[in-house]
Swiss-Prot record:
The lineage of its organism: Bacteria, Pseudomonadati, Pseudomonadota, Alphaproteobacteria, Rhodobacterales. The chain crosses the membrane at residues 7-27, 33-53, 76-96, 108-128, 161-181, 196-216, 235-255, 272-292, 297-317, 323-343, 369-389, 402-422, 442-462. Keywords: Cell inner membrane, Cell membrane, Membrane, NAD, Quinone, Translocase, Transmembrane, Transmembrane helix, Transport, Ubiquinone. GO terms for biological process: ATP synthesis coupled electron transport. This is NADH-quinone oxidoreductase subunit N. It comes from Jannaschia sp. (strain CCS1). NDH-1 shuttles electrons from NADH, via FMN and iron-sulfur (Fe-S) centers, to quinones in the respiratory chain. The immediate electron acceptor for the enzyme in this species is believed to be ubiquinone. Couples the redox reaction to proton translocation (for every two electrons transferred, four hydrogen ions are translocated across the cytoplasmic membrane), and thus conserves the redox energy in a proton gradient.
Length: 483
């Protein structure tokens, strides 16, 4: 019944109605008067919806004849997306106000992007997949170019739009091939057509094009070319958003497509995903070494981290998917904490992103410097921080799946990547103070966000805490996807 179908989409419907109410409210009030309240209200609603999904979710359900799937896997991804988007909205308030970017459109566009992400991770059909992906993408194209008086921001939005349209074209072409040779757009029908050793060649080409389109969305090399420029040119809160929620959505969608639609031909996509993983890990690790802008560094860092997440996915097992989900949850926490600090990097009242400005920061702000040290070491995978356990999980999954060569490559890439994280720590503690150093000022909410994430990352390994209990939900989610 239609009412049962709509009940499954309750969070998406509530968020969409809230976005429309926000638009109407802005029309009938003075310009941007509701912007700050709208941001806080949106963050609160995201948290409420995450709690609602966690409490009410049970088993697996389908809506609209299998186009939408509500299961443990989609719920895990949705909760991660909602909480990360809420955190980004909260830590961005000070920056957006100072930069005169606090417009009512900002939270509205974030809501629409999040709704698109939630549809993506619940997609059980190529049409639902494409609808969710385009809703997310169209909203993010706009927010990337929000700073209309900045050439770099406009350039970032244009590059993201052009290359995003190319990736959408690849995805759509692959979907059309899959539909043509499988005779259906539903994942359940495609996996039946792909079973056995006689998969149509056209369906294999469809898989390749779909994989290429999804690789663009997760910033996997060699489809990463948009990431550094868009990260650098976009307003920093938007960069923080790009580095968190959309990555979770795209990676979850990637997992759902390869397992739900092409789970019967793991051998055909496993090597492709493994190739994407190893190229991403090494390109991100090596290219980040020479960066002088911390936002570009975080862009290459995200490329490398997506390679590690793809390593878990390439295992083709429930253990691999579980490791990928754990890795993405930890990755989001690390990036929220890091960007909470980047958002407040100021010199003489002006926002800066030069890595050199961190020189001797520890002598001014020892507490903040210690929190950043925790973030950097965790991103590098130094034990016993959470980042180490995330990498350990995907490495073990790869080894257990027989991909020993990929695990060895991951260890080497991790060692290379540790250099640029340690360089930041070295600058903070052993660099020479000069006139280009940071002011050290930080708003209350970003400061709380930084310290909270540092505590999460630093204490997650403690016995009794056990990664804050994300292992059991991740295991359930993986088992639900690979059934």
């Amino acid at each position: 019944m239609i009412s049962a179908d709509l009940a499954i989409l309750t969070p998406e419907i509530v968020l969409s109605l809230f976005a429309m109410a926000g638009l109407l409210g802005a029309v009938y009030t003075s310009k941007d008067a509701l912007a700050s309240a709208m941001c806080w209200g949106t963050a609160a609603l995201f948290i409420i919806m995450a709690f609602y999904i966690g409490v009410t979710g049970n088993g697996a359900r389908e809506a609209f004849d299998g186009m939408i799937i509500d299961d443990a896997f989609s719920r895990f991804a949705k909760i991660t997306i909602l909480l990360s988007a809420a955190a980004i909205l909260m830590i961005s308030q000070d920056y957006m106000a100072k930069a005169d970017l606090l417009r009512f459109e900002f939270p509205v566009l974030i809501i629409l992007a999040v709704v698109g992400m939630m549809i993506m991770v619940s997609a059980g059909d190529l049409i639902a997949l494409y609808m969710g992906l385009e809703l997310q993408s169209l909203a993010l194209y706009v927010v990337a170019a929000m700073r209309r008086d900045s050439v770099r921001s406009t350039e970032a939005g244009l590059k993201y739009f052009v290359l995003g349209a190319l990736s959408s074209g690849l995805l759509l072409y692959g979907s059309s091939l899959a539909y043509g040779f499988a005779g259906t757009t539903q994942f359940a029908g495609i996996i039946e057509a792909a079973q056995g050793g006689d998969m149509p060649l056209g369906l294999l080409f469809g898989l390749v094009f779909i994989t290429a389109g999804l690789a663009f969305k997760v910033s996997a090399a060699p489809f990463h070319m948009w990431t550094p420029d868009v990260y650098e040119g976009s307003p920093t809160p938007i960069t923080a958003l790009f580095a968190t929620a959309p990555k979770v959505a795209a990676m979850a969608l990637f997992a759902r497509v390869v397992h739900d639609a092409f789970g019967g031909v793991i051998g055909d996509w496993q090597q492709i995903v493994a190739f994407l993983a190893v190229v991403s890990m090494f390109l991100g690790a090596i290219a980040a070494i020479g960066q002088t802008d911390i936002k570009r560094l975080m862009a290459y860092s995200s490329i490398s981290h997506m390679g590690f997440a793809l390593m878990g996915l390439s295992a083709g097992t429930a253990q691999g998917v579980e490791a990928m989900l754990i890795y993405m949850a930890i990755y989001v926490a690390m990036n929220i904490g890091t960007f909470a600090f980047i958002l407040t990097m100021e010199r003489n009242g002006r926002h800066v992103t030069e890595i050199s400005s961190l020189s001797a920061f520890a002598s001014k702000e020892p507490t903040k410097a210690l929190a950043i040290l925790v973030m950097m070491f965790s991103l590098a995978g130094v034990p016993p921080l959470l980042g180490f356990f995330g990498k350990y999980a995907v490495l073990v999954a790869a080894v257990d799946a027989g991909l020993v060569w990929l695990a060895i490559a991951g260890v080497i890439a991790s060692v290379i990547g540790a250099f640029y994280y340690i360089r930041i720590v070295y600058l903070m503690y052993f660099g020479e103070a000069d006139e280009g150093a940071l002011d050290g000022k930080m708003g209350l909410v970003p400061y709380v966000g930084l310290i909270a994430m540092a505590l999460v990352i630093g204490l997650g390994w403690v016995p009794g805490v056990n990664l804050f209990g994300i292992e059991a939900p991740a295991e359930t989610a993986a088992a639900m996807l690979i059934r």
